[in-house]
C-alpha cells in the first residue's frame, strides 16, 4: 500500500488480535467479534481491575463485553495519522505519504473510509476485500455511504477537538 512500518491504517498493520485474560470475570475462553479501538483499552483494563477511570482519560470501558454482559455490536473505531516526518523511509513518495494527515473510520458492518485532504481517499468493504485492494471510493453507488461515514468522522473530530483538514465529500 505504499507505506512502511506500522504507520498505516491498512488491516495488515491495524487489525491486531487482542487477548485479555480476566479469570475473575470469565472462567471460560471465548472469542469476541467486533471492532475494538486501542483508545478503549486502558479504561477497559482499569474497570476490569476495579480501579477508577480518570476523567481526563479518553476512551470508554468495554469491560461489560469481557464479562459477557454486552457485545461490540455497533462499535465504530476512529483512527488518525498526523504525519510523522521523523526519518527517511526510502523514497520521496513514501516520505510524502508518511507526512500526510489521515482520518479513518471502521464501521460496525466492516466498511472502512480513509480520508485525506492531500491524497486520494479510500473506501473498502472489509467483508469482501479484507486486504483492501479494491478502492470503492469513486463508485457512484457508494456516495451516500461515504457521506454518512465522513459525517461520523467530522462528528468525532468535533467531539475530540481534532482540526485536521478533510476533503469535501
Question: Residues of each region from the PLM?
Answer:
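Histidine-centered active-site microenvironments of extracellular/periplasmic hydrolases
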Residues: 1-37
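Active-site rim elements
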Residues: 5, 26-35, 48-53, 133-142
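C-terminal cap/loop subdomain of S1 sulfatases and analogous C-terminal strand-loop tails that border
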Residues: 39-42, 47-122
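Short, solvent-exposed turn/loop segments enriched in Gly/Ser/Thr/Pro and often Arg
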Residues: 3, 58, 78-82, 161-169
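Conserved beta-strand positions that form and line the central face of beta-propeller blades
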Residues: 8-9, 18, 31, 61-64, ...
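Long, internal low-complexity/basic segments
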Residues: 15, 136-169
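A short aromatic-rich beta-strand->coil structural motif
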Residues: 18-19, 45, 107-140, 149
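A structural signal for well-ordered alpha-helical segments within the folded catalytic domains
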Residues: 13-14, 36-43, 57-60, 118-121, ...
Amino acid at each position: 500500500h505504499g507505506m512502511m512500518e506500522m504507520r498505516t491504517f491498512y488491516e495488515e498493520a491495524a487489525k491486531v488480535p487482542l487477548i485479555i485474560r480476566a479469570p475473575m470475570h470469565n472462567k471460560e475462553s471465548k472469542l469476541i467479534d467486533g471492532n475494538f479501538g486501542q483508545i478503549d483499552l486502558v479504561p477497559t483494563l482499569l474497570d476490569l481491575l476495579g480501579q477508577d477511570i480518570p476523567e481526563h482519560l479518553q476512551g470508554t470501558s468495554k469491560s461489560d463485553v469481557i464479562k459477557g454482559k454486552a457485545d461490540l455490536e455497533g462499535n465504530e473505531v476512529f483512527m488518525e495519522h498526523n504525519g510523522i516526518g521523523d526519518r527517511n523511509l526510502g523514497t520521496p513518495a513514501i516520505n510524502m505519504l508518511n507526512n500526510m494527515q489521515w482520518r479513518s473510520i471502521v464501521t460496525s458492518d466492516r466498511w472502512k473510509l480513509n480520508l485525506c485532504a492531500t491524497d486520494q481517499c479510500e473506501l473498502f468493504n472489509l467483508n469482501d476485500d479484507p486486504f483492501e485492494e479494491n478502492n470503492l471510493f469513486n463508485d457512484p453507488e457508494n456516495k451516500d455511504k461515504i457521506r454518512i461515514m465522513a459525517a461520523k468522522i467530522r462528528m468525532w473530530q468535533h467531539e475530540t477537538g481534532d482540526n485536521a483538514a478533510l476533503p469535501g465529500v
